[in-house]
Amino acid sequence: MTYARIQGVGSYIPQQILSNADLEKMVNTTDEWIMQRVGVRERHVIANSPDNTTTMAVDAAKRAIEMAGIDPAVIDMIIVGTATAEYYFPSTACLVQKHLNLREDIPAFDINAACAGFVYALSIADQYIRNEGAKHILVIGVDSLTKVVDWKDRSTCILFGDGAGAVILQAHKEPGILNTILHANGDYSDLITAKSGVWERESVPHLHMYGKEVFKLAVTKLGEIVDEIIEKSGLKQSDIDWLIPHQANLRIIEATAKRLGLPRERVILTIEQHGNTSAASIPLALDAAVRAGKIKRGDTLLLEAFGAGLAWGAALLKL
């Protein structure tokens, strides 16, 4: 049996840091209030730097390729999960292909599942390796949500940071991705929006979110999907070594960990330093944990994410 196994990870975050103390000067908020409500102390932001969605994706990809120890010429697919592409078209994936000078006989495309984008992209890549003969796939999660937040809205501007994370998936006989599950419900599409499309747009697109409703749904749906994927994989909660959640809200993360019976020290947390980086949050957290020596080859990881759409998903894998 052929598995898709993570061979290398990489990430990138902008240099500029926006702290809660900085936000206290911009909106009516406090460090104590932000930490208590969401668990964010600081976030990295593009601001006026030369960084953008494409450059961050490229830098994260380079680091993943370096860790994987592969020749970039062997990459036979690029999938980018992002909701904040630099352009309507071309895709971010094609721009990454250009900057990495990858060969042309490969598919490269973006998918938009907002904060769940990386898990969606990972699931698609897994199927291409299992069923279509792909050998090395570059999967990236990247977003620049600080470019669409309303800096006068204290309920949302405190949440988000910018960044990118990437993995190299390689076809392997040893177990890698065991299962993925993806769900969506468009009936809740108005709960998180940023209207910048062709047909309906704001002069300056801003992210709007009904936070209380999103919180309740996230706790419920993530709890259900982690139970579903563990059962589908024939495992027990005690088999999970690490939970790597989407870093959206500390209270949501704690609720999922409690449902799994996982102590806090078995949960990878970067929300305090990164904020919510949308599709980048899971690969950013994974990269940080691998490079810190926390997560090791053979560990069983549960990834889960929830975002606009509403779209949510989970992946269970052996590193």
Curated annotation (Swiss-Prot):
CDD domains: KAS_III
Region (ACP-binding): 247-251
Keyword Lyase among record annotations: no
Chief location bin: cytoplasm
Metabolic or biological pathway: Lipid metabolism; fatty acid biosynthesis
Binding partners and assembly: Homodimer.
Function: Catalyzes the condensation reaction of fatty acid synthesis by the addition to an acyl acceptor of two carbons from malonyl-ACP. Catalyzes the first condensation reaction which initiates fatty acid synthesis and may therefore play a role in governing the total rate of fatty acid production. Possesses both acetoacetyl-ACP synthase and acetyl transacylase activities. Its substrate specificity determines the biosynthesis of branched-chain and/or straight-chain of fatty acids.
Free-text domain note: The last Arg residue of the ACP-binding site is essential for the weak association between ACP/AcpP and FabH.
Name recorded for this polypeptide: Beta-ketoacyl-[acyl-carrier-protein] synthase III
